[in-house]
Amino acid sequence: MVRNIMAKEFSRTRRIAQQLQQELAQVLQRDMKDPRIGFVTVNDVDVSRDLSYAKVFVTFFEEDKAVVQEKLNALISAAPYIRTLVAGRMKLRVMPELRFIYDSSLVEGMRMSNLVSQVINQDKAKQQQFGSEEASVEDEVLGDDVADDADETEGKD
């Protein structure tokens, strides 16, 4: 019995977190006119069990850490206003207090993907450069093996 109540509670917080993520994304794209924030992506929302706090994980497509910190500070200062806008769109008795946290995982993932792509391209270039030399060496070695095989079959007849 207790387990079912806890499972329902967690699924409710998960549903609220998903809806909060969608509403925050819309509010930040359409309703926020602060030029300091710019383009922001809401990656995830983690709501506390009692629904009093929500950690909002965001990403900015900026490499400069100072610019990222400025944008994050602008979001943090606008959090009460954003909370009011989102509260008008959601039917909750208590709207969680928003805590914005910069999530570098997306930027880090893109950086890692670019590094992997660079290594793959370098390997392809090396294969093309050395591939023709290796192919001619393999032909010479295989040619000798074929000649040896021919000599062996002639001796058996």
UniProtKB/Swiss-Prot annotation:
SUPFAM superfamilies: Ribosome-binding factor A, RbfA (SSF89919)
Keywords: Cytoplasm, Ribosome biogenesis
Pfam families in UniProt: RBFA
GO MF annotation terms: ribosomal small subunit binding
Compartments where located: Cytoplasm
Assembly notes: Monomer. Binds 30S ribosomal subunits, but not 50S ribosomal subunits or 70S ribosomes.
HAMAP family xref list: RbfA
Protein name listed in UniProt: Ribosome-binding factor A
Species annotation: Shewanella baltica (strain OS195)
